[in-house]
Amino acid sequence: MKYGICSLSVIPMRANPAHESELVSELLFNDIYTIVDENEEWLKIKGCYDAYEGWIRKLQHQSISHDEYQGYISREKYIINKAFSLYDNKILSFGSKIFEKTSDSILLRNNFDRLSFTESALKLKDVPYRWGGKSVMGIDCSAYVQLCAKVAGYKLPRDASQQAEHGTEIPSLTSAYPGDIAFFENNNKRITHVGILLSEDKIIHASGKVRIDKIDSTGIYNEELKGYTHHLAYIKRL
């Protein structure tokens, strides 16, 4: 098996090995991965953190050995907990990992901190929405929740439908706490959106941009549009 590490600020992951293919996710600095397929110009990779797969360009690949790969897994890590940080002549995005303490990083923990979860969520307010994005240059709804949870010490999968399998269901918004996660469904009852509750009537989520909106038992109400944009399915507590 072959291994790699993201040595750039961010690397796009695409659905197919083509420049015009859909962006499905992104690698952040020091993310490690395995190679599962390749052609002349592209590598299909699987991320170590969330097992998400996509194609990256070979020109952006940095090879590492099996021993180095295992070493990165076991090594103590710090995580950028500011919207962005200048490190080693690179602009690193929120959620990127490094191997030394800086003023913009905290130790990557394994125990969930609810306060850190909501504080992290607010740090990314007004970051633009981008389908498949995972950085401050553009982020989608599930990557936003995944990264905030990562900084707060909880490992969530990449997609909203997968995230919905985690946690304990909360019966209603009146029973919800800040830091609970709200999931939203389409007409086919499929989970298509996710956000973080700030209170029983406020939610922060990525839709157009990372924004704060009203929420009630029906769903998210956008005051600018004067209407509901997402239909509430259920609430989970990590």
Spell out what each predicted region is.
Residues 154-218:
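...with weaker cross-activation on analogous glycine-rich loops/strands in unrelated enzymes
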Residues 16-29, 86-92, 172:
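SH3/SH3-like (including bacterial SH3b) beta-barrel domains
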Residues 121, 136-152, 157:
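Active-site nucleophilic cysteine motif
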